[in-house]
A protein has these predicted regions:
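Conserved NAD+-utilizing ADP-ribose enzyme module
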Residues: 1-2, 9-31, 56-58, 67-178
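Membrane-interacting alpha-helical segments
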Residues: 18-50
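Short, well-structured hydrophobic secondary-structure segments
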Residues: 38-71
Length: 178
């Protein structure tokens, strides 16, 4: 599956040196309220694509498509979100399909905010139970459907347990703009 991931240059150097890249927990950006959402995603990955390697707790993230388009990311837009001048690398990668879990980027934010996630407006529940809410979160994996509730151009993210050096097709170097 053709994907694109943006990594810090230091992470890319680790990939080149060791032959693989895994998420380093000390660099993750989800302390506090977001951790339960990420832990839920990890559980879903285990169910849907299999167990991670023993040394892996959290996934590597990439893009499958951005705003409805399957193509290389436009780095004029995607080089923000960190300290200005930080070296980053846009990797074009080909990960085996059975090792990737796709999810809807916009819907993911409902999960991050601990909300109920209906696919259709008619399915919205005013005060869902915890079980109803958690079950609704599985809608984040419905990346191929169009609904009246989610009509924006789809941005689809990909998660997988590790990135192997041999999956890298192209590496392009950039600097964060701020």
């Amino acid at each position: 599956m053709l994907l694109w991931t943006i990594q810090h240059k230091a992470a890319y150097d680790i990939l080149l040196e060791t032959g693989r890249l895994i998420a380093n927990e000390k660099h993750l950006l989800f302390e506090g309220q977001f951790r339960p959402s990420y832990d839920w995603l990890v559980d879903q990955m285990k169910k849907r694509i299999g167990m991670p390697p023993n040394d892996v707790k959290y996934p590597v993230w990439a893009w499958y498509q951005w705003e409805g388009v399957r193509k290389r990311l436009d780095m004029r837009t995607h080089r923000y979100g960190g300290e200005r001048g930080t070296p980053i690398v846009l990797l074009t990668i080909d990960v085996p399909d059975n090792m990737v879990l796709l999810s809807d980027f916009d819907m993911w934010h409902v999960i991050l905010n601990d909300g109920y996630l209906p696919l259709y407006g008619k399915d919205d529940i005013e005060d869902p139970s915890e079980d109803e809410k958690l079950k609704s979160w599985e809608n984040v994996f419905c990346v191929d459907i169009e609904t009246d509730w989610w009509d924006a151009l789809k941005s689809t993210q990909a998660t997988f347990w590790e990135l192997k050096k041999e999956w890298v097709l192209k590496a392009e170097h950039f600097v964060l703009a701020g």
